Amino acid sequence: MKGTGLNNFPQFGVMEGVKILVCGGAIAGPFGATLLGEIGAEVVHFESPKNPDSVRGHYGYSQNHRNQLSMVADMKTPEGLEIFKKLIKWTDIFIESSKGGTYEKMGLTDEVLWEINPRLAIVHVSGFGQTGVPEYIDRASYDAVGQAFSGYMSFNGTPKEAMKVSPYLSDYVTALNTCWTALAAYVHVLRTGKGESVDVAQYESLARILDTRPMEYFTDGKEFPRTGNKDTQAALFSFYTCKDGGEIFIGMNGYGPVRRGYPLIGLPKPGDGDPEIDEILSGWMADTDLGRRLEAAMEKFVSEHTVDEVEKIMLENQIPCLKVYTLKDCAKDPHWKARDIFVEWDDPMMGRVKGLGIINKWKNNPGEIKWGAPLFGENNEEVLKDLGYTEEEIEDFAKRGITASFDFDQTYEIYKLEELFPHYREGFTERWKKEEE
């Protein structure tokens, strides 16, 4: 927000007073800082005047950079590097996302940063990590690269085609990993007084949630063919298409659901005298003759009922299930409304917008959206003043291109915003009218 600097961040939330400097663009690094900023952390997003965040001009930037300040300076100049170092001295946690080894090549090793701030928690986020095979370390990465290299993509899709999980699973899982590792490093600093550095690799973040599949591969040599939405292990634990085309997930597994659920789909309960089904305790393997018999019974049942009918019948009998929601369904659902997931906030480019709010409900110290994503370099002046620079120095930095800030017409030209978001100019104009008043 215009007028906010390092010394007047709003005070709220469980992360109140914790300072975070984040360098890098897109999702994997900055989004973790955003989550902490929404519960009170003081976040400054540091960008290059020649290489702005690649998601600026898109909805993702608006939602994923709330409660942040924007500082833009060229670290390749002595003055810009000095600004960066002063921010390192100010901050508690430094998060950077770039190709592995980038900061080391710039001469900004962890040891150099700790000379400036011995109590600094550092998180390096990259596609392939800071160590390992050099030709991998130096590669750029996108979400789909992380999904492919982690092996995650190989489990999703059909036998004919692998499929990436949308939207941007690898990026967001890495951001969540970044978030908790930053906090763990910070706790270590608080406990010991000594800095810590963490190397977060995008592909490893996703590999860590491959469930037991790596263990099964290395222990038993098991391989996992792609089967679409059908569970490869348990029968009656999958997605089904109903009479009206509606889709629903049903999980008829566990001692209770098996006994309550089988009669609903025309099967006897275990113990009723069917020699095959009497063997079942809490479920059965999918790829067996009995598993195929169970699936055939369910397919027949859903083909005779609409998705709403199936959901009602299953829920009345305490069978875990839910039809596949669209965002339209989410927006209308009373439970979503009751928990205030969708909220409005003011965006400097678009005006009043609506999207996802703050997840996790804090009883005593709730999170808040104080302002929308900042404009490019919007807080340069305030941040530089709080770092001790004079007005003359700040003006000189801008004139020489060491710092840069938002230029509306230039931004339109770069991002073709009129094509993407026709309401941008109107929202921007309204915002600055209010500020001038």
From Swiss-Prot:
EC numbers listed for it are: 2.8.3.25
Which segment of the chain is annotated as a signal peptide? none
Reaction(s) catalyzed by this protein? deoxycholoyl-CoA + cholate = choloyl-CoA + deoxycholate; allodeoxycholoyl-CoA + cholate = allodeoxycholate + choloyl-CoA; allocholate + deoxycholoyl-CoA = allocholoyl-CoA + deoxycholate; allocholate + allodeoxycholoyl-CoA = allocholoyl-CoA + allodeoxycholate
Q: Would the keyword Transferase be found if you checked this record's keyword annotation?
A: yes
**What pathway does the annotation place this protein in?**
Lipid metabolism; bile acid biosynthesis
PANTHER family recorded: L-CARNITINE COA-TRANSFERASE, SUCCINYL-COA--D-CITRAMALATE COA-TRANSFERASE
Please explain the role this protein plays, according to its UniProt record: Functions in the bile acid 7alpha-dehydroxylation pathway, which forms secondary bile acids via the 7alpha-dehydroxylation of primary bile acids, and is carried out by intestinal anaerobic bacteria. Acts as a bile acid CoA transferase with broad bile acid substrate specificity. Catalyzes the transfer of the CoA moiety of secondary bile acid-CoA compounds to primary bile acids. Can use deoxycholoyl-CoA and allodeoxycholoyl-CoA as bile acid CoA donors and cholate, allocholate and ursodeoxycholate as bile acid CoA acceptors. Shows no activity when lithocholoyl-CoA is used as the CoA donor.
Q: What is this protein called?
A: Bile acid CoA-transferase BaiK
Q: From which organism does this entry originate?
A: Clostridium scindens (strain JCM 10418 / VPI 12708)
Lineage of source species? Bacteria, Bacillati, Bacillota, Clostridia, Lachnospirales
